[in-house]
Amino acid sequence: MTIELQEVSARELAKKYFRGGEKSLAELKARIACGLAAREIDCETQARVFEEALEYVILGGRINATAGVEGVNTTMVNCFVQPIADSVFDPVDGVPGIMEAARQAAQTMRLGGGVGYDFSPIRPKGAWIAKTKSLASGPISYMEIFNSMCSTVISAGARRGAQMGILRCDHPDIEDFIVAKRVDDANMPWDRRPFRNFNLSVGVTDALMQAVEVDGEFELAHVAEPGPDIKAQGAYQREDGKWVYRKVRARDLYDKIIRATYDRAEPGVLFLDRINRDNNLRYIETIAATNPYACGLPAESGMENPL
């Protein structure tokens, strides 16, 4: 069955994906098929196989934009997650520090990839920094660096870069993160709005949802030692080594997430424990973040959105 393109679909197809004088969907599919088959032993036969398959599937945007385009050094992968350590410059256990992570993310976006980050490892605002005898500014302040970087870097194909910022629900700065994109003036110009180059999501754990269900307290904790003022307010160290900065009523925290989402459509939520239970590679990895593009998980009723 052949489905005719709607006018808006044809216009967007031409704007985003046509290359080298292409004028039709058939020409686009032929170019993609040849590009994907280029390294096969029998590339002509494989190209025909790919072209036939393209009658039934829609590939990712980066493949549509770059496959078969000569002289273009870009990625054909849409989705990346950039690790970040709790360090400004130095790597920690092989994970790059904040500035190096920003450099790597800039390169990824320049080549066409969308990038997600878990900012939870970064110590909270008010945490103690022993090397400089000072207090940390928190992950939200460092997110400004990534936001500005994304504004500057034009992604492959001259499109704006895409970023997803994630913070765990038990991070001590989570309440500030929830309202980080709040704008009180509806007339504020778009280019002046906070974190306009980010989608934001809260990493929600089973522990939070269970505390919400029983109307219990929920601990906001981090491995970083808090500063003197936070200690004076009652912060304490748990048996697992993490510091509990404070406790909140779970339903109040969850309500803040829901109200912010209702008012501004952000932040979203990632059900981290559910995602990792459904991850086929859970025995060798833990998923802490996603990139900006939503995905689906197969379920009996069809594709189910875990986000």
Language-model regions, residue ranges each:
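Extended catalytic cores of very large enzyme megasubunits
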Residues: 1-307
